[in-house]
């Protein structure tokens, strides 16, 4: 054996025995940086049990061959290297390691000039440059993608086209760990583009537990976390109103800062609904715009549609313009096409354009706003449409001067339009002065303001010109006492925080003033500390009242964790009420109900909370809400709540997520109204975590606002790195079961042992 002169490489010729004796080893390229440019690969370093030259500029290495050159490592039982052609021929337990691809097989032929070659019977593993897997483009951060893992597979042959492209024939692809082929993609040809980080499969079949479940003649997918254009996983579902529901979205990655999604939706009872969404984010603008259109609803023999336009544009660092447009074709659109309670109960859709300017001590807004009111066809009482604001101008200002005196101004001018009611303009201004005085143990804040309002009404009003002017005075004060104590070996701090809030506003007759945008607030803890019991500008209460409350907090001294907070409060009236809304009787009592509220994390696993409103004069309960949540660990949550309001609500709400067996989780919700004698929402679901795949199913019954209910079924199979198939129940589960976590977020590593109950 010899080292040939004139080699453009360095050969380390070491017998196995001498290598062991002298301690020499070949330091392989662990980092595997980017390959050198074609034709300038640089020297090759070789180590083997035996190395010999068999021809000019040709060496043959035998036994435990290790070689390194230009950011890639070779391993084989036998390797031949031609320095003239810069060509490698390797056989027997061949392994090639590149920055984004590790591959092993039987025989390798590889040209180091252009990185072309061929490997037979390969087994490969992809090493993504960003992250460790694939996330659906529009679902990042939503919990819809399974844990990201490296892709792997095998093939009959792999052809290396160049440094960044290769093709595998008769290949498989999966993200399951080695030894687990629960699911894999079987393809006739698989192209890997490492520059674009995209894999393209031809004649692809998805096999799950040995059963083919999906075939496509063409499929591409990202090899990292980057977004890319392509068909997203289809979703399947069913509802009573629309029947089978199939959606096949197509995602368009138009640019890093804007994209679009097209989603044809086939509804077996109604027809084909075409939908599209466009999103963009620029330095000076941004928005989300969506349109759904069903040309002919077979149930109603007419078109159905929904439009949502939400856009903003920044004119300057302090000024923005924007528009929001929500509209549907008919009153029943959401009941027919949605299975979310928050959507099916929508009554008014907002449509507005605006311009806003925000500065350090003042802000201004000009807008025009109208609503689409959705009537309930099954209800005998029609919904009164809210007033349109055509237009509304608002000005806010704050300024501090002198010895901490705070000046604040809220001014508003609006024309209210509603053809079925009194219309007109309202101008109001409310300047205030307040002086906050605080120290380490308490505070006192006096405030005085002057409210001025002017109305110019149309000819249908009894009085066309109305003015209202009145002063408003308030005094807010509170102190804090604290003491340390120990319980069960743990140091705590308890506070006692009494607070008093006095308000005075003289009576002004407001019976001739129409109600444009005003409602009476329900009495609660937050409303105890407000000057006005009405929200909106059309009523200002006459007030001569004092609110007293006390709060006590129990806090761990070492951690600052608040274990328990309890509040007790009541308001006292010194004059009878005179200002009311039309049809509402004035109060007859000189005190309000007593309010009680509590919350806290009483142990590591238990959270509690509740509130109550009690009529002390009649000894009755007006309302109460009690809740508890037991959360001993991720994926283990039990929620219980009870909600009662006199002559209105009497509901119990139970929900849970819990491991049933190893890899199995169960979820449910039972929300029942005893007042209406009906199920508000019922949900039952199961979830199985297979490590590199996840199967979940759920069934939901949801009461709609028309006193009926709708049933929905969800069934979804998630394949790690390939997306999901079926109807996605995650939004429903997270909304219905507070604290719910998908099991792949609880145990993000597929090899990790999953718990038993």
Indicate residue ranges for each PLM-predicted region.
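Cleaved targeting-peptide boundary
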Residues: 21-29
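Bacterial N-terminal signal peptides that target proteins for export
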Residues: 1-7
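N-terminal signal peptide c-region/cleavage motif recognized by signal peptidases
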Residues: 15-17
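Outer-membrane beta-barrel proteins and related beta-barrel translocases across Gram-negative bacteria
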Residues: 101, 107-173, 178-189, 193-757
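Hydrophobic helical h-region of N-terminal Sec-dependent signal peptides
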Residues: 8-13
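Interaction modules related to DNA damage response and DNA replication/repair
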Residues: 30-41, 45-47, 62-78, 91-105, ...
């Amino acid at each position: 054996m010899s080292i040939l002169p004139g080699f453009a490489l360095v050969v380390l010729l070491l017998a196995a025995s001498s290598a062991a004796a002298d301690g020499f080893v070949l330091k392989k390229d662990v980092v595997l940086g980017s390959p050198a440019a074609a034709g300038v690969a640089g020297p090759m370093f070789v180590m083997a049990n035996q190395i010999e030259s068999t021809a000019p500029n040709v060496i043959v290495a035998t036994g435990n061959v290790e070689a390194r050159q230009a950011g890639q490592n070779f391993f084989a039982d036998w390797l031949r290297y031609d320095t003239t052609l810069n060509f490698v021929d390797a056989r027997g337990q061949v392994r090639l390691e590149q920055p984004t691809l590790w591959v092993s097989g039987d025989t390798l032929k590889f040209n180091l000039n252009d990185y072309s070659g061929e490997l037979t019977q390969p087994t490969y593993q992809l090493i993504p440059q960003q992250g460790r897997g694939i996330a659906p483009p529009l679902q990042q951060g939503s919990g819809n993608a399974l844990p990201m893992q490296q892709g792997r597979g095998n093939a009959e042959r792999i052809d290396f086209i160049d440094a960044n492209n290769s093709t595998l024939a008769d290949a498989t692809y999966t993200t399951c760990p080695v030894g687990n082929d629960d699911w894999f993609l079987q393809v006739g040809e698989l192209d890997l583009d490492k520059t674009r980080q995209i894999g393209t499969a031809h004649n692809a079949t998805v096999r799950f537990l040995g059963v083919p479940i999906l075939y496509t003649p063409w499929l591409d997918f990202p090899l990292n976390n980057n977004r890319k254009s392509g068909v997203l996983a289809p979703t399947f579902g069913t509802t009573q109103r629309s029947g089978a529901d199939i959606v096949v979205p197509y995602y368009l990655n138009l640019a890093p800062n804007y994209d679009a999604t097209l989603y044809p939706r086939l509804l077996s009872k109604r027809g084909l609904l075409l939908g599209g969404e466009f999103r963009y984010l620029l330095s000076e603008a941004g928005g989300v715009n969506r349109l759904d259109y069903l040309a002919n609803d077979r149930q109603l023999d007419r078109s159905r549609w929904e439009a949502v336009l939400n856009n903003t544009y920044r004119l300057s660092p302090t000024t923005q313009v924007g528009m929001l447009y929500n509209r549907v074709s008919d009153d029943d659109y959401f009941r027919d096409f949605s299975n979310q309670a928050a959507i099916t109960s929508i009554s008014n859709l907002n449509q507005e354009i605006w311009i806003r300017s925000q500065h350090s001590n003042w802000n201004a807004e000009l807008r025009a706003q109208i609503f689409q009111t959705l009537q309930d066809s099954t209800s005998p009482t029609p919904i009164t449409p809210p007033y349109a604001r055509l237009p509304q101008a608002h000005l806010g200002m704050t300024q501090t001067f002198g010895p901490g005196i705070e000046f604040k101004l809220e001014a508003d001018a609006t024309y209210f339009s509603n053809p079925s009611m009194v219309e007109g303009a309202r101008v109001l201004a409310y300047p205030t002065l307040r002086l906050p005085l605080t120290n380490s143990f308490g505070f006192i804040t006096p405030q005085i303001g002057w409210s001025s309002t002017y109305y110019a009404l149309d000819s249908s009003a009894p009085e066309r010109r109305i003015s209202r002017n009145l002063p408003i005075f308030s005094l807010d004060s509170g102190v804090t006492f604290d003491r340390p104590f120990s319980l069960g070996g743990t140091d705590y701090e308890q506070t006692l925080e009494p607070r008093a809030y006095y308000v005075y506003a003289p009576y002004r007759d407001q019976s001739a003033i129409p109600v444009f945008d005003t409602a009476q607030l329900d009495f609660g803890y937050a409303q105890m500390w407000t000057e006005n019991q009405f929200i909106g500008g059309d009523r200002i209460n006459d007030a001569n009242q004092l609110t007293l409350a006390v709060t006590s907090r129990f806090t761990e001294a070492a951690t600052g964790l608040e274990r328990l907070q309890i509040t007790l409060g009541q308001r006292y009236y010194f004059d009878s009420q005179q200002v009311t809304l039309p049809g509402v009787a004035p109060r007859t009592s000189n005190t309000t109900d007593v309010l009680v509220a509590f919350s806290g994390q009483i142990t590591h696993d238990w959270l509690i909370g509740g509130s109550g409103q009690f009529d002390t004069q009649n000894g009755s309960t007006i309302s109460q809400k009690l809740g508890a949540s037991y959360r001993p660990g991720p994926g283990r949550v039990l929620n219980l709540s009870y909600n009662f309001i006199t002559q209105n609500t009497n509901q119990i709400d139970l929900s849970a997520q819990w491991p049933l067996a190893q890899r199995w989780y169960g979820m449910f919700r039972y929300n029942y109204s005893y007042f209406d004698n009906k199920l508000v929402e019922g949900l039952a679901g199961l979830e199985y975590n297979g490590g590199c795949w996840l199967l979940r199913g759920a069934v939901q019954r949801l009461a709609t606002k028309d006193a009926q209910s709708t049933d929905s079924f969800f069934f979804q199979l998630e394949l790690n790195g390939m997306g999901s198939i079926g109807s996605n129940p995650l939004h429903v589960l997270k909304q219905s079961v507070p604290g719910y976590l998908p099991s792949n977020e609880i145990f993000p590593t597929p090899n990790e042992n999953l718990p038993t109950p």
